[in-house]
């Protein structure tokens, strides 16, 4: 895998608050190598390590995108939901930004059935098929469609398991991470000071609570994916 330059600036990361970890009482000792200091009861993340692992992650996603691989971005915190959707759409990635449904990947056959149902209902709605039904039946189907849109809207074009999964909060998305580990799907995960750095294939130490921090990391990864996609198109 070729190493590239991704313009990861330490001062820019500081302005985004990437270096702020959790309180010193709420930490995972395995994160010690990624912590540079304690300040006012808060662990400070070593941004040099962040830059190194973020650069590695960018190299990985660029390489995968340049070979036409598929990505899934998972971030279900309310405050990050819109950010996740916009970033994923920009890079033509699948995404889950509302709720991870248990077994979404490990029980893929069930997820596929839900996606088929979702597509059928969307087609029915577009062709005004609901208007030909009794009001009560139409209302039931509209509720089903709304629910499916909420939980599966970001993966509606997914036809198989993703090649790489990007996880924006290890603790919040632990079920998703475990499913990826079970299936052997490579993962990139943001890890705050209360996380386990040994679970994902590439763990990026960073503040996973502040929107500015999540945006900074996600924008770098999405840029690398977009660059890789451009390379794939040029070489096709």
From Swiss-Prot:
This protein's UniProt keywords: Chloroplast, Plastid, Ribonucleoprotein, Ribosomal protein
Gene: rps2
GO molecular function, one term: structural constituent of ribosome
Disulphide bridges: none
CDD domains reported for this sequence: RPS2
A Pfam family reported for this protein in Swiss-Prot or TrEMBL: Ribosomal_S2
Gene Ontology BP terms: translation
InterPro entries reported for this sequence: Ribosomal_uS2, Ribosomal_uS2_bac/mit/plastid, Ribosomal_uS2_CS, Ribosomal_uS2_flav_dom_sf
Any GO CC annotation of this UniProt entry: mitochondrial small ribosomal subunit
Family statement drawn from the similarity comment of this UniProt entry: Belongs to the universal ribosomal protein uS2 family.
Highest taxon in the source lineage: Eukaryota
The protein's name: Small ribosomal subunit protein uS2c
Subcellular location: Plastid, Chloroplast
Gene source species: Capsella bursa-pastoris (Shepherd's purse)
Keyword Protease: no
Predominant location category: plastid
């Amino acid at each position: 895998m070729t190493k590239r330059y991704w313009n990861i600036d330490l001062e820019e990361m500081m302005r985004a608050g990437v270096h702020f970890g959790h309180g010193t009482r709420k930490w995972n000792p395995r994160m010690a190598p990624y912590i540079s200091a304690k300040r006012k009861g808060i662990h400070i993340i070593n941004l040099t390590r962040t830059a190194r692992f973020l650069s590695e992650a960018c190299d990985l996603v660029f390489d995968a995108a340049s070979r036409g691989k598929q990505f899934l971005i998972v971030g279900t915190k309310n405050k990050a939901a819109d950010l996740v959707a916009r970033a994923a759409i920009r890079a033509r990635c699948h995404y889950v930004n509302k709720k991870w449904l248990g077994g979404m990947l490990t029980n893929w056959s069930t997820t596929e059935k839900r996606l088929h149902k979702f597509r059928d209902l969307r087609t029915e709605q577009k062709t005004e098929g609901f208007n030909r039904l009794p009001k009560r039946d139409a209302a039931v189907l509209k509720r089903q469609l709304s629910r499916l849109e909420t939980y599966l809207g970001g993966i509606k074009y997914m036809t198989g398991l993703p090649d790489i999964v990007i996880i924006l909060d290890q603790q919040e998305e632990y079920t998703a991470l475990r499913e990826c580990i079970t299936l052997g799907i490579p993962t990139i995960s943001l890890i705050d000071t209360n996380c386990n750095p040994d679970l994902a294939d590439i763990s990026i130490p960073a503040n996973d609570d502040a929107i500015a921090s999540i945006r900074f990391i996600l924008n770098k990864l999405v840029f690398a994916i977009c660059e890789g996609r451009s390379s794939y198109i040029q070489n096709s």
